[in-house]
Amino acid sequence: MSKVIGIDLGTTNSCVAIREGDETRVIENSEGARTTPSMVAFADNGEMLVGQSAKRQAVTNPANTLYAVKRLIGRRYDDPTVTKDKALVPYSIVAGDNGDAWVEAQGKKYAPSQIAAFVLGKMKETAEAYLGEPVSQAVITVPAYFNDAQRQATKDAGRIAGLEVLRIINEPTAAALAYGLQKKNGGTIAVYDLGGGTFDVSILEISDGVIEVKSTNGDTFLGGEDFDARVISYLADEFKREQGIDLRADKLALQRLKEAAEKAKIELSSSKETEINLPFITADASGPKHLVLKLSRAKLESLVDDLIQRTMEPCRAALKDASVSAAEIDEVILVGGMTRMPKVIEAVKQFFGKEPARNVNPDEVVAIGAAVQGAVLKGDVKDVLLLDVTPLSLGIETLGGVFTRLIDRNTTIPTKKSQTFSTAEDNQGAVTIKVFQGEREMAADNKLLGNFDLTGIAPAPRGVPQIEVTFDIDANGIVSVSAKDKATNKEQQIKIQASGGLSESDIEKMVKDAEANATADKAKKELVEARNQAESLAHQVEKSLAEAGDKVPASDKAEAEAAIAAVRTALEGSDAAALKSASETLSQAAMKIGEAVYKAGQAEGAAGAGAPGAGATGPNGEKVVDADFEDVDDKKSA
């Protein structure tokens, strides 16, 4: 039975884990790291780079290096948060054909789900390399406060990557699952999850293998990227004040600032001050300019203090929805790389009135929880029951544009709820059901998930027809809605797809593109391996020829030299088959050289057998043979 992997698809970094027996293992990638940058780059030669290789070349290729794309998943292009993001990144955010926010690299448009799929593909490869077998099933985590459109887009990303997504699980819930599995005693816990791009807080109760989410809250556009942006702005402002040049206008300089800001932020978690030194950051008529600046922890904290305070309001709301006070929280778990910042730890400690638990790795615990959930779904882990909730209220638009809730936020999922509505006009033959998600009282202020029409309603005065609307939320938090006319039993049902979202044909095309990319990547890998083998073989044979000298017959030597020349010619091209063929010919020639050297060695040995050193003739002509003598202990021979 194939393994189910757990993937933490992060804004900044991603992580993959697997449950093996009673242990959950985080899998190292090909570079030996336990987390992989959620970055995808497209080089000028058309090659796609994912992870660390993409990050390494970001400074020289900023316009085609895509990062933090998770923040765009399931969002419309005209979303205010997208407009804000456009000013912060060096790559292009464009409008997709469906009105969603897409990205552009090397002149080609990509859906955020596609970019996420490339990262998931890297996680899949990492797991397959470790397991030595194909992987087709996964549990993928999302921020708890992701809406339906964002969850659906994440599931689409898994499908594009060639994965069957068995479950979409909330990140804080996954962390609690990993934590709860090792915790013997029950209790009420708070998970404070501040990652690269999103913030979530969940209140959970753990008791006898049951992990129940009581409430969740958060902000899907608040994370480490925003902290970096504050540092970037500070550096750019300081440089402009000193040199009169705005570095924000230079994409290459902006990418260097981004890397320096992230590095400084990390360093200031363990030191009080750091120096940012960026030589040749730009130039003007007077010559090159360098950025050299000291940044203290106190200055960083003052730059981001309001961002840290923004996380406190969701914490208050989560406690209120769970009907518990901060004093009733038994333990606080910190998740996400940003929770390493001392100021964040201090703020959490102050809010909850207790020291946060330090026995979990904030970068890995979510992936571990996802792997545990995968094992639960496979039946490998028993006696664990996970009860999650829907983060936002669901309802429809009714007369006057009012948002009428059918399912309140923090309702345990899966769940199903029905409510009966009627028509607003006499003889109304059809109704349009508009489905919204959010907490505002007017429908227009909430997120429109989708709409559909129920037609063929029997003519009747307003208020008479009975139209039953049913909401069904599955364990992934994905919504289906149906409407039925009770008089005619006519029913219309839709699985909610974002008002933009990817169509089935879009997804199928992207799956094919991903498969084509995988084939191309395999071909590139084969070519690289063939090149390496050919170069190594050519060098080896040249060395053998030089060492052998005249021991090799002229015909064999000429054949080997011709084979080496053929390999060198093939190395100039990019035909793996031609390289392999030339290498095979050279390999045969190498064998002949080896045989010739061996025969020459044997002949020398045979000739040397009768030489003076091997024996001598005595004075009377008799043969005297050299012999080795060994002293023997008399006692032993007695």
Curated annotation (Swiss-Prot):
Source organism superkingdom: Bacteria
Tagged with keyword ATP-binding: yes
Keyword ATP-binding belongs to the record: yes
Gly residues bias: start-end ranges: 607-618
Any Pfam family the entry gives: HSP70
Region of interest (Disordered), residue spans: 604-638
Gene3D superfamilies given in the database record: 1.20.1270.10, 3.30.420.40, Actin, Chain A, domain 4, Substrate Binding Domain Of DNAk, Chain A, domain 1
GO molecular function: ATP binding; ATP-dependent protein folding chaperone; unfolded protein binding
Protein keywords: ATP-binding, Chaperone, Nucleotide-binding, Phosphoprotein, Stress response
Modified residues (Phosphothreonine): 198
Upregulating conditions: By stress conditions e.g. heat shock.
HAMAP family from the UniProt entry: DnaK
Annotated function: Acts as a chaperone.
Family, as annotated: Belongs to the heat shock protein 70 family.
Protein name: Chaperone protein DnaK
Species, as recorded: Gluconacetobacter diazotrophicus (strain ATCC 49037 / DSM 5601 / CCUG 37298 / CIP 103539 / LMG 7603 / PAl5)
